[in-house]
């Protein structure tokens, strides 16, 4: 088996598709591997500031079962001889098995397609976690031996020792079967991803990143390393290649250029290679905004994925921006603002949630022009499904049919009693939410009053340990406290049917997505950063040939959209509708105000980046408003300066 310091790349791809379908025993004999090991004597190669280097002449290509824990050059030579003998035997076996493999080929391909659809070995299950940074998942994992595990992507298997988890763990896999919201799980995961997507560095332009990634995907890992790493590869070479793949290591090593750093950066490079292989490749025939418009006009089964950005124009805050909901509740003193949506915390003290729930309460029966755009797709029989992360239920106000809508995180549409399950229309508890009061279940309240009428003394008590549902009081406490009845703090509390951390996802999500990935012909991602599972992993489940278009205020670097239309969601939707003609006029009262009365005079488009295919949709009206606001602020600052005070002193408070 590989030594503790060895990183082994296994190329399980081959010219014949049948070779990939052999059973595990044969596969272990036929796989080709490339072993990365630091050069034990760097003085024999070129000296680079006396740093350790990786000599590619020490990389051995041998059958996996011939790799020993010692990795000496003598063993490598012996392994090469064994490889030649085994290759001859393999050729004879392949000739004998060729006819049988051809007969089985159709059946195997059908099984592979079914596996991809169902999210089994080849593709990820929709329940699998993605890391908290929103980076796409690399692959599932399959055991190779008792001491190793492998990661399979596009026919290339990367193997590491189980006792070295830095590379494997960076995949952020969680093998649990629960359906809890993955975002919180990932935030608490100690094995966080060691890479972050970043196109901001000046040294490497996006065009070179795209070229490097394309070569890797088209030619495989072995040829990629031969082309992009020199014969004696140093740490500098490895780091440069990581950057050239479009990633920056999250953590910097402090040990200088010693052997430990070399091995660590090799692992990070391996991780980058895996990620690139998992990223969707942009289609070469869809590159311009006109291509995007034609797709929207002609597609018949459009999947729309939406987030908080489609509702911010109505005054509903997003969650993660500097002025978003989580920033607004810092005063609660929670270790993590997301805890307001933690089920255990809600059961122990529902007051915390209801003290801030009014801030995210949806407005009464209004919706944005972007919601009208989705409704228009539905009216034209083009909407396959709208998968929304929003809990405001504004889609229903816009007229989107229930069968065309999946509310992935639940919504305020209904509310349920956490004790007896009694369900009501969500708007019934809106008055209590607006008043920062806890709404209670009428049925459980009757039970409570009935107990009180029996003359028993009642006392509200909050406990850390969650009580069972349908149990109005604790019998043990009653006996211990001489007849006193203790009601749990959350007894009979009504809770909006929002999916809290600790609750299962809506069942209709799983059913719908497994159907829709086989029907969709266009994906529109609108108003979301795609950082929260399960919605974040949908784009990775869609077949690569299906076009993907982004409509968002900011670009998303960890996904490869064919075209990105950047700007405020209402402006982008209005631009699309205006360009497609009168039959696409949005059924919203603000549509003409946004686009301008004279055929879209307020809206303009600008190409930002031809390589990334990013376009900016801007609105003159918004620009004028911003300019007026800036002028107003500038005038106020000038008045403050003339009065001899600094701006932050104007309120009488010292900075």
From Swiss-Prot:
Positions annotated to bind Zn(2+): 417, 420, 441, 444
EC annotation from Swiss-Prot or TrEMBL: 2.3.1.286
GO molecular function (one): metal ion binding
Residue segments, region Disordered: 1-148, 164-201, 455-482, 619-655
Bias (Basic and acidic residues): 620-648
Cofactor requirements of the protein: Zn(2+)
Major place of residence: nucleus
InterPro entries listed in its UniProt record: DHS-like_NAD/FAD-binding_dom (IPR029035), NAD-dep_histone_deAcase_SIR2_N (IPR007654), NAD-dep_sirtuin_deacylases (IPR050134), Sirtuin (IPR003000), Sirtuin_cat_small_dom_sf (IPR026591), Ssirtuin_cat_dom (IPR026590)
Domain of life the protein comes from: Eukaryota
GO biological process: heterochromatin formation; phenotypic switching
Keywords of the record: Metal-binding, NAD, Nucleus, Repressor, Transcription, Transcription regulation, Transferase, Zinc
Assigned protein family: Belongs to the sirtuin family. Class I subfamily.
Protein name, as recorded: NAD-dependent protein deacetylase HST1
Organism: Candida albicans (strain SC5314 / ATCC MYA-2876) (Yeast)
Classification of source organism: Eukaryota, Fungi, Dikarya, Ascomycota, Saccharomycotina
Gene giving rise to this polypeptide: HST1
């Amino acid at each position: 088996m590989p030594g503790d310091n060895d990183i082994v790349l296994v190329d399980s791809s081959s010219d014949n598709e049948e070779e990939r379908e052999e059973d595990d025993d044969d596969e272990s004999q036929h796989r080709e591997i490339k072993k990365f090991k630091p050069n034990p004597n760097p003085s024999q190669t070129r000296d680079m500031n006396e740093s350790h280097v990786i000599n590619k002449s020490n990389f051995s290509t041998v059958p996996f079962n011939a790799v020993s824990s010692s990795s000496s050059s003598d063993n490598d030579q012996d392994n090469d001889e064994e490889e030649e003998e085994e290759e001859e035997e393999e050729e004879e076996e392949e000739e004998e098995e060729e006819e049988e493999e051809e007969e089985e080929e159709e059946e195997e391909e059908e099984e592979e397609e079914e596996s991809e659809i169902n999210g089994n070995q080849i593709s990820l299950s929709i329940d699998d976690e993605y890391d908290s940074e929103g980076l796409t998942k690399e692959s599932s994992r399959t055991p190779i031996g008792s001491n190793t595990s492998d990661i399979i992507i596009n026919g290339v298997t990367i193997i590491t020792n189980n006792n070295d988890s830095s590379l494997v763990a960076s995949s952020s896999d969680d093998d649990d079967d629960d359906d809890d919201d993955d975002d919180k799980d990932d935030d608490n995961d100690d094995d966080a991803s060691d890479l972050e997507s970043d196109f901001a560095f000046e040294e490497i332009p996006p065009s070179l990143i795209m070229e490097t990634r394309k070569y890797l995907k088209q030619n495989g890992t072995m040829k990629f390393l031969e082309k992009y790493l020199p014969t004696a590869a140093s740490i500098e070479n490895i780091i440069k290649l990581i950057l050239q793949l479009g990633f920056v290591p999250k953590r910097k090593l402090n040990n200088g250029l010693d052997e430990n750093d070399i091995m660590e950066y090799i692992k990070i490079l391996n991780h980058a290679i895996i990620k690139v292989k998992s990223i969707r490749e942009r289609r070469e025939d869809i590159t311009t905004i006109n291509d995007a418009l034609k797709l929207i006009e002609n597609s018949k089964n459009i999947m729309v994925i939406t987030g908080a950005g489609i509702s911010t124009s109505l005054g509903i805050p997003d969650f993660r921006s500097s002025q978003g909901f989580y920033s607004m509740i810092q005063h609660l003193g929670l270790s993590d603002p997301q805890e307001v949506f933690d089920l255990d915390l809600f059961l122990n003290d529902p007051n915390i949630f209801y003290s801030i729930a009014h801030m995210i309460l949806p407005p009464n029966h209004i919706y944005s022009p972007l919601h009208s755009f989705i409704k228009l797709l539905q009216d034209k029989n083009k909407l396959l499904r709208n998968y929304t992360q929003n809990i405001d239920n504004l889609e229903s106000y816009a007229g989107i049919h229930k069968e065309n809508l999946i509310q992935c995180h639940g919504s305020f549409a209904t509310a349920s009693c956490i004790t007896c399950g009694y369900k009501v229309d969500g708007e019934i508890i809106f008055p209590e939410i607006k008043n920062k009061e806890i709404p209670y279940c009428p049925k459980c309240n009757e039970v409570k009053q009935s107990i009180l009428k029996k003359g028993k003394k009642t006392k509200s008590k909050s406990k850390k340990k969650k009580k069972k549902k349908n149990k109005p009081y604790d019998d043990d406490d009653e006996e211990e406290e001489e007849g006193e009845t203790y009601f749990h703090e959350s007894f009979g509390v009504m809770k909006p049917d929002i999916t809290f951390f600790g609750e299962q996802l809506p069942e209709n999500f799983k059913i719908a997505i497994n159907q829709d990935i086989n029907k969709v012909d266009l994906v529109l991602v609108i108003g979301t950063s795609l950082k929260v599972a399960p919605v974040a992993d949908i784009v990775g489940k869609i077949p690569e040939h299906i076009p993907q278009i982004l409509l968002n205020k900011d670009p998303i670097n960890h996904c490869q959209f064919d075209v990105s239309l950047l700007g405020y969601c209402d402006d982008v939707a209005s631009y699309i509708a205006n360009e497609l003609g009168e039959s696409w006029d949005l059924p919203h009262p603000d549509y003409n105000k946004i686009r301008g009365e004279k055929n879209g005079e307020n809206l303009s488009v600008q190409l930002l980046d031809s390589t990334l295919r990013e376009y900016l949709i801007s609105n003159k009206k918004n620009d004028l408003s911003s300019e007026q606001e800036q002028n107003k602020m500038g005038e106020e600052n000038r008045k403050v300066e003339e009065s001899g005070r600094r701006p932050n002193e104007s309120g009488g408070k010292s900075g």
